[in-house]
Swiss-Prot record:
UniProt cross-references to InterPro entries, sorted A to Z: Transthyretin-like, Transthyretin-like_sf
Name of the protein this chain belongs to: Transthyretin-like protein 2
Signal peptide start and end residues: 1-17
Swiss-Prot/TrEMBL keywords: Glycoprotein, Secreted, Signal
Family: Belongs to the nematode transthyretin-like family.
Broad class of the protein's primary localization: secreted
Positions bearing carbohydrate: N77
GO (cellular component) term, any one: cell surface
Localization terms from the record: Secreted
Pfam families: TTR-52 (PF01060)
Protein's UniProt keywords contain Secreted: yes
Annotated transmembrane regions: none
Length: 148
């Protein structure tokens, strides 16, 4: 790649991170987490926005839009906004220990929020219902995290 192309990419990333261009966009997601059919209370969830246009961690890291924990019924409801030049790509991250035994760290997987559930503005106009999510199974792309 030429030095001008690299310089251009760095410049675009720098300008985007200055937060004076782009538009505020929002998303919301709700659902119910269960472990072997029982409410998974206290499970940490985050609503994130993907900034991996050029590959993971290149120029801009993913933005945290909201975070919280599942209530005593395993239910969660997150809503947040972020400023981006292009359309946002929100997703839910779930950190849990269901069926994990004494394995260190937590199991982590993500659920994408459909683009049709995003909008311009600082508050979400509709909420994506992820339904009941059973944590006992293994999810595609599931990883582990000790830092969350």
């Amino acid at each position: 790649m030429s030095k001008y192309a690299i310089l251009g990419l760095v410049l675009v990333g720098t300008v985007a991170s200055l937060d004076f261009i782009g538009r505020t966009q929002s998303a919301a997601i709700k659902g119910r987490l269960v472990c072997e059919g029982k409410p998974a209370s206290g499970v940490k969830v985050k609503l994130m926005e993907s900034d991996n246009s050029f590959g993971p961690g290149f120029l801009d890291s993913d933005d945290k839009m909201a975070s919280g924990k599942a209530d005593s019924h395993g239910e969660f409801n997150l809503s947040g906004s972020t400023k981006e030049i292009t359309g946002i790509e929100p997703y839910l991250v779930v950190f849990h220990d269901c069926k994990d035994g004494i394995t260190p760290c937590q199991r982590v997987f993500r659920v994408n929020v459909p683009k049709s559930y995003t909008n311009s503005g600082s508050s979400a106009k509709k909420t994506y219902d992820a339904g009941v999510i059973e944590l006992a199974g293994k999810y595609p792309g599931e990883t582990r995290s000790c830092l969350n």
